[in-house]
Amino acid sequence: MMSLSVRPQRRLLSARVNRSQSFAGVLGSHERGPSLSFRSFPVFSPPGPPRKPPALSRVSRMFSVAHPAAKVPQPERLDLVYTALKRGLTAYLEVHQQEQEKLQGQIRESKRNSRLGFLYDLDKQVKSIERFLRRLEFHASKIDELYEAYCVQRRLRDGAYNMVRAYTTGSPGSREARDSLAEATRGHREYTESMCLLESELEAQLGEFHLRMKGLAGFARLCVGDQYEICMKYGRQRWKLRGRIEGSGKQVWDSEETIFLPLLTEFLSIKVTELKGLANHVVVGSVSCETKDLFAALPQVVAVDINDLGTIKLSLEVTWSPFDKDDQPSAASSVNKASTVTKRFSTYSQSPPDTPSLREQAFYNMLRRQEELENGTAWSLSSESSDDSSSPQLSGTARHSPAPRPLVQQPEPLPIQVAFRRPETPSSGPLDEEGAVAPVLANGHAPYSRTLSHISEASVDAALAEASVEAVGPESLAWGPSPPTHPAPTHGEHPSPVPPALDPGHSATSSTLGTTGSVPTSTDPAPSAHLDSVHKSTDSGPSELPGPTHTTTGSTYSAITTTHSAPSPLTHTTTGSTHKPIISTLTTTGPTLNIIGPVQTTTSPTHTMPSPTHTTASPTHTSTSPTHTPTSPTHKTSMSPPTTTSPTPSGMGLVQTATSPTHPTTSPTHPTTSPILINVSPSTSLELATLSSPSKHSDPTLPGTDSLPCSPPVSNSYTQADPMAPRTPHPSPAHSSRKPLTSPAPDPSESTVQSLSPTPSPPTPAPQHSDLCLAMAVQTPVPTAAGGSGDRSLEEALGALMAALDDYRGQFPELQGLEQEVTRLESLLMQRQGLTRSRASSLSITVEHALESFSFLNEDEDEDNDVPGDRPPSSPEAGAEDSIDSPSARPLSTGCPALDAALVRHLYHCSRLLLKLGTFGPLRCQEAWALERLLREARVLEAVCEFSRRWEIPASSAQEVVQFSASRPGFLTFWDQCTERLSCFLCPVERVLLTFCNQYGARLSLRQPGLAEAVCVKFLEDALGQKLPRRPQPGPGEQLTVFQFWSFVETLDSPTMEAYVTETAEEVLLVRNLNSDDQAVVLKALRLAPEGRLRRDGLRALSSLLVHGNNKVMAAVSTQLRSLSLGPTFRERALLCFLDQLEDEDVQTRVAGCLALGCIKAPEGIEPLVYLCQTDTEAVREAARQSLQQCGEEGQSAHRRLEESLDALPRIFGPGSMASTAF
């Protein structure tokens, strides 16, 4: 805990520095207004705008407010400031490097998405941080250069001083000696001036301190109506402000923030005056504070004691900027801008869109001109804006006219984000990502595109030429959630997609999907004539929406998707409106291959009728792809359906279930028409998104589970590993009714393994009715990963801990590691469960969440388009959609119930430890102990995350789970004996006690009966961090996790299990003897008590003798403590133990702690003892006063000041109040 130290002539009581909790990575520095108060402090509402220093130039500011250059250098002071400055710059670099690594990780994780605009924004942030890092490194090198020059001048000055002293002390000699003396004196003066000049130059590189007033805290000293004046002096810089205490507990100040330029040789002087009348002012206190500790990367909340008793505290939020305001680089605020997740959240908020950039306007104009050149019709104005911060649909007026900036909606603070960001004006620019080479998405089209993946600014011709030669790579296949069609039209507007490539005739009907495992590349000619007419349709109606075609057999690996790919054999070469058909033969060795050829005949733009033809191949696994033969250049395209050799339609029922359950497939070649086939409603938008997203296929966590609504694309030939593996065209019992629609795309390697693994379910005939297939999907059981149905204990514990960490964010830098590990654990759990939707803690807005946000656009249209005959009364579609949309479809789990239970215990233990943080006053042992335990828990979570690859593999021994940093024989063997025939992650304490007694009971019982049980109970209590009940309790007993066992053993000094048992047995025997009722046994134990054996329990037993023992025992204990305290190791251990006793709930324990501190004469205990004299009960106050008298001159002086203050002021707290007020 860093504290704001004061000048040597003044001592501060409990001067505490906390990290500001207002820094959360969401709100920028200008957005952290008075609404975010300091812990439970009331809100400050200044009546007017804060008085900020005017924006002066650097020279005028330095001459007007800065400290003048010193005439005498102070190298010692400069060394201290330089060390603190380097520490602050290093922290700045580390914070920004961590942010850079997180952004790069987000880029890697998001590359399966089609949000290329979002990736581009991440890339801009990364480059901005890189520029700022280079600026920081240059700034640090400049400071190092100045310091090295200063050190050189210092050595020269010291040498000149030695020369002058040598000539001066000696007898005056010749003229040459006098000349040499004058030369040395002149050199000394020059070096002194050079050092002063370098000091001023270094002082100019210190940056700025931004001070924000948080308020006064004063217990009973602050009354309603009181007025205070605070005057701060820092060199020649001043800040004076006045405030008033309102009746509602609010404090109103006439000024809120200011900027101080750091100085090398000055201290910050703070004077607080209470204004009681026109000429009656009472000075509350005046202090001078050290400022070198304020060079920190993160904002800090400084709590300064104004008076000696600490009854008046001033709270300031101090933020250090390494650069001056006039010297700020453009990228200096890269980490301080709104976080990436916040920007994504505001993207999908219901706010007006941003004005499109010049690149977008040029793109829209180019598309419009291209359409007019082709058929003279205007391009649809209902295309969606591709701006990353725009709303989902834009009218033509909104797209081409300026719109007001949306208010950034700030979510809750995030655990994964590095804080201290500042806003940055978003701008559009060229995408410089990997996917920029292949703008077309995985299924070859993007009618629901969110980003402009590739826009050429050169000319329309260059853009068309570029689009004609682009090919699709594996990365583009892995990206891009792209719903099959648009939502229903709104108020007369008609759906019209924004194609990601520059061809307006890009295909919008083929929405068959593909996996990313062993991805067989499949391409599609975009500029087909009938698709152009679909894009240019202007009449609204359900019949205008092209219907997607899907094949849904269990392991059917077939689809013909469309992309712009020149070298692919399944490509239509387009010249103008002429289509050259190319026939390609698709051969597979798998059991089933479905070739789907969408047959669409468009007679006019107002009568677009989707009629997909579904074909099932025979077991010969050989079929010929359809030949696309354009009949005329008038945008009428007919497609010859492939020959069907198997009369059974495979999997069409499920497709109809997801889109329109009222139109079953009657024959393999029968075209199915659906007037509401594409009906995006608030409950079906996610479903449609998953049906057409290439990154939505079967969950990798369940082997043999295939994607129901989508199939991977088929290249020229596709070979399956096991051609004889049975396949089922409907969901097997292992399937979840909602899982195939919501599972994200796993890693390519995972999908490769999955695609080659056979399905364990037996082959069954395909259902021929969509309602039947949907009913089967709904009735399938939902497996629970935690072993129980709907067990959400792990998810609840994780959410509770992240919510608790949000309350302490920024106050304790030690918690950053824990927060990172908790966020990492959550991401691993969600990744394992196949969850890509956002949680409230991480706000990772994915495509599913985005489509859910857009579903409100089509609520009215869905109601208008729903015909009573289109949906049967008993249709279970609503239930299926609810199960699909439900964010709690599957609880988070590691796949191992025992590991889940162990994690739950650790997460709740962390939440309990967090409650011990943030206490007010000098009693901080419990807080320090809790922070130490939290650091250990962070290492435990890190070990669990590192173990994530083997979560589902049953561990047979503790050696497979944890590893000690040093060799500790016997410990893991003992744990394996405890968990024999049990899971190695958890063990009941009764089982540990029984195993310990069986192994060590015979040997320890020889020394004293029951010693083995006492040793094991002490071990368990130390490992668990809590006392065990002495009597059996109802309900499940306490359990010890392998990670608690491992973490505790790592802290021990004993090298082996045998040595630990022996040492602990000696300590337990000593404590028993000290607590004996026989005075002779107690005195004998005191005489023979070795220094090394007196640990926490032994020291507590000694201190209790100072309260409960007779005079002879008390004298012996005092003598023993004084003699043992001469050793530094024992003194430190005893000091920590006795200070910890001051925070115990038992009054007698606190009294014993006070008396023990007096025995060892610890000046470190003066401040806590003074605090107890003011706040605790009469018995504790009396013991504290007695101990203060024994703490030397300093303790006696503190006691005198305490008595004077208590005589002058009424009692602040009554007996037994034990104030634990927290800021």
Swiss-Prot record:
Annotated GO MF terms: 14-3-3 protein binding
Biased composition, class Low complexity, residue ranges: 380-395, 505-523, 546-564, 601-650, 659-675
Superkingdom: Eukaryota
Sites of Phosphoserine modification: 22, 349, 351, 456, 459, 874-875
Positions in coiled-coil regions: 89-114
Phosphoprotein as UniProt keyword: yes
Skewed-composition ranges (Polar residues): 565-592, 680-695
Keywords recorded for this protein, A-Z: Coiled coil, Cytoplasm, Golgi apparatus, Phosphoprotein
Pfam families in the cross-refs: PL48
Residues with Phosphothreonine modification: 355
Region (Disordered): 375-411, 475-769, 856-889
Gene Ontology annotations for the cellular component aspect, listed alphabetically: cell leading edge; cytoplasm; cytosol; extracellular exosome; Golgi apparatus; membrane; vesicle membrane
Skewed-composition ranges (Acidic residues): 858-867
Any single biological process term in GO: establishment of Golgi localization
Cellular location(s): Cytoplasm; Golgi apparatus
Family: Belongs to the RIPOR family.
SUBUNIT field: Interacts (via N-terminus) with RHOA (GTP-bound form); this interaction links active RHOA to STK24 and STK26 kinases. Interacts with RHOB. Interacts with RHOC. Interacts (via C-terminus) with PDCD10; this interaction occurs in a Rho-independent manner. Interacts (via C-terminus) with STK24; this interaction occurs in a PDCD10-dependent and Rho-independent manner. Interacts (via C-terminus) with STK26; this interaction occurs in a PDCD10-dependent and Rho-independent manner. Interacts (via N-terminus) with 14-3-3 proteins; these interactions occur in a Rho-dependent manner.
Function: Downstream effector protein for Rho-type small GTPases that plays a role in cell polarity and directional migration. Acts as an adapter protein, linking active Rho proteins to STK24 and STK26 kinases, and hence positively regulates Golgi reorientation in polarized cell migration upon Rho activation. Involved in the subcellular relocation of STK26 from the Golgi to cytoplasm punctae in a Rho- and PDCD10-dependent manner upon serum stimulation.
Protein name stated in the entry: Rho family-interacting cell polarization regulator 1
Lineage start: Eukaryota, Metazoa, Chordata, Craniata, Vertebrata
Name of the gene: RIPOR1
